Amino acid sequence: MAASESSAALDRPDGLRHQHLLDLSPYEADEIQYLLDTAQEFREVLDRPIRQVPTLQGTSVASLFFEPSTRTKLSFNLAAGRLSAETVSLSKASSSVTKGETLKDTARNVEAMKVDVVVLRHPSPGAPHFLARCTDSVILNAGDGAHAHPTQALLDVLTMRAHVDSFEDLNVSIIGDITHSRVARSNVQALTTLGATVTLCGPETMLPVEMEAAMDVRTTTRLDAALDGCDIAMALRIQMERQNAGLFPSTREYHRQFGITADHLRRHPDLLIMHPGPVNRGIELTDAVVDHERSIILSQVTNGVALRMAVLYVLAPRREEA
């Protein structure tokens, strides 16, 4: 069985009190800020002609992705490579899961290969927590169902931090399918922990009413209300299968009510735009908004590598400590 977080925390090399990154609920504001500070240092490394450092040489990182991913998987692999870690990737199609192997068996086989860090994306909420209980490897959650996506939220707040003086004075609106969004949940956890004010906006069928009280946010079904006094608007990708489930009538109607346009930018001259990607152009955001100078979407992508370098740097075991 895995060592408990409390005992493992004593051995953390750089001050975090956690062995894993499963979700952000146990992380305090100072721990989040520490990860952001570390990521900012690696952001500067990525601007150098030589972008690789030997920090995790000899450390092994396995990416287990049981859902499709492009940006997150590539970002984690690049981050591990920039730190000189040994990397191996496994997808559902190439794993023995297709032959009936359980997640627990997969974890034990990975551990038997002496893998230090497992980056896991899985369609089942709680899968990373399960893995953390049955292996001694460090587990990093790369997205589990609609539950959590902690590194996405951390790279988002890292991106925001470059444009604000204080999170305590920051107003962020998250717009879209909140109910089914792990990105929204993790961003709410990070932002409220740091002291920001968060508004959730979307169709009534996509707004979980329990989040307003449980997570100290406000909700609205009106885009204008969400953008009033807002500093940063984060649009979420609409999953087209939700239309088939009757959660919104059509993409045209969704865009009419919740799509952000150039007109919104004209009416809110200081508003910054974010999106975790991939963007459905013409639905969540118009082309003009995606490509606008106040869109910081590409900064999110760049910061993703730096943030994941920071997470690996802080949580991965050092070979000299083994």
From Swiss-Prot:
GO BP of this protein: 'de novo' pyrimidine nucleobase biosynthetic process; 'de novo' UMP biosynthetic process; amino acid metabolic process
Keywords per UniProt: Pyrimidine biosynthesis, Transferase
Residues where L-aspartate binds: 99, 182, 237
Signal sequence annotation: none
Coiled-coil regions listed in the entry: none
Enzyme class: transferase
Superkingdom in the source lineage: Bacteria
EC number(s) stated in the UniProt entry for this protein: 2.1.3.2
GO cellular component, one term: cytosol
Reaction catalysis annotation: carbamoyl phosphate + L-aspartate = N-carbamoyl-L-aspartate + phosphate + H(+)
Residues at which carbamoyl phosphate binds: 71-72, 121, 149, 152, 277-278
One Pfam family matching this protein: OTCace_N
Pathway the protein contributes to: Pyrimidine metabolism; UMP biosynthesis via de novo pathway; (S)-dihydroorotate from bicarbonate: step 2/3
GO molecular function, one term: amino acid binding
Record SUPFAM superfamilies: Aspartate/ornithine carbamoyltransferase
Summary of the function given for this chain in its UniProt record: Catalyzes the condensation of carbamoyl phosphate and aspartate to form carbamoyl aspartate and inorganic phosphate, the committed step in the de novo pyrimidine nucleotide biosynthesis pathway.
Similarity comment: family membership: Belongs to the aspartate/ornithine carbamoyltransferase superfamily. ATCase family.
Quaternary structure note: Heterododecamer (2C3:3R2) of six catalytic PyrB chains organized as two trimers (C3), and six regulatory PyrI chains organized as three dimers (R2).
Full protein name: Aspartate carbamoyltransferase catalytic subunit
Organism of this sequence: Salinibacter ruber (strain DSM 13855 / M31)
